[in-house]
Amino acid sequence: MPSPHTTYTCQGTHIGHTRRVNEDALFVNEAEGLWLVADGIGGHGNGDKASAAVVEHVESYCQRNSVDDSLADITSRLRQAHQTCRNMAGAGMPGTTVAALIIFQSKAILIWAGDSRIYRLRGGELTLLTEDHNLAQERYRRGELSREGAQRLKSANVLTRAVGVHQDLHLDADVTEVEAGDRFLVCTDGLYKELPLEKIQSMLGASFSEHILTALIEEALQRGGKDNITGIVIDVR
């Protein structure tokens, strides 16, 4: 059954002002309804190998016959990428975050590990659809910290889940409704950590064009650009 929605996409990545290597990666297959970012976190400059492994394993993804089958397929591919990273001998144990959005008919399938994020703009209101996997967020969930306190902690950067890092890969997933007029942002932390939520919301609310993501990246660069910056904007009609 074909999707009742049409999507339009713009995407981009930038090395930022301080990194020597862009360890971010992105993948877009609009025909199959898949959008993904990965933020390499490996030591010794090997994070780019991990994020590239994720892209390599999802490149041949084809939409399945149901939400469950689509979720199972992308999960399997990410587990294969996880094993590829684990098998990289002498590569400094490279790892990567991942955040993927699949639009299947009238559903949005979200799957992620780490602190790359998926936002949705609907009716002018921006909502974060994913939850970061880091030590600070764990303490916030346990009630030990306020959200503001968690964001200030250095442990906000210490990931508890990622592709390739731990023995087992633990992914979070969610399924939500898609409506015409929705706009999604899939991005790495180099984008959202530089921009206040209100700024992301206002910039995403502009008329859709290929320049929306470019403008977000330029704004992040002007505010510091301390990390690699990668994002994808998906407009649903």
Across the structure, where does each feature detected by a protein language model lie?
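PP2C/PPM-type serine/threonine phosphatase catalytic domain
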Residues: 1-237
